[in-house]
């Protein structure tokens, strides 16, 4: 008789424990129900990037002195700088500057070490193309002013800040 009573008590304890675990899982599910959705409708909604975001590189042709510091600090020697030495004034004249964004790792070393600040990072991150050769930007494409998402009235911008719990 006693083994039957102990088995029944064991069964009751296991039932209570299982109900408690199910209740804990349900409480976690309910706590997540009040949160905002994580997904965004991408073409129509875009996240506002942070101030230090590393997007497409912007290049100012007039400021560049063709010192090639950007090439030396790049971990993959990516920027292609073509220049000609002007013998009468003993200065380099920049002929062509290009970066292949298909290879670029967006480390930002070229921007950080540029002595004339002719390179800067923008908030543009939409660089996808159907042909990888279109990702090779010359000085004209690099000099194009960045498109700001904040100024586009057709796109709903979403601030990407962590929630502060009070």
Curated annotation (Swiss-Prot):
Molecular function terms, GO-annotated: 4 iron, 4 sulfur cluster binding; iron ion binding; NADH dehydrogenase (ubiquinone) activity; quinone binding
Subcellular location: Plastid, Chloroplast thylakoid membrane
Assembly notes: NDH is composed of at least 16 different subunits, 5 of which are encoded in the nucleus.
GO biological process: photosynthesis, light reaction
EC number: 7.1.1.-
Organism taxonomic ancestry: Eukaryota, Viridiplantae, Streptophyta, Embryophyta, Tracheophyta
One Pfam family of this chain: Fer4
Family: Belongs to the complex I 23 kDa subunit family.
Statement: the UniProt record of this protein carries the keyword Translocase: yes
Identification of the protein by name: NAD(P)H-quinone oxidoreductase subunit I, chloroplastic
NCBIfam families listed in its UniProt record: ndhI, NuoI, PRK05888.1-3
UniProt source species: Trilisa paniculata (Hairy chaffhead)
Cofactor(s) demanded: [4Fe-4S] cluster
Positions bound to [4Fe-4S] cluster 1: 64, 67, 70, 114
Domain 4Fe-4S ferredoxin-type: 55-84, 95-124
UniProt cofactor note: Binds 2 [4Fe-4S] clusters per subunit.
Membrane topology: Peripheral membrane protein
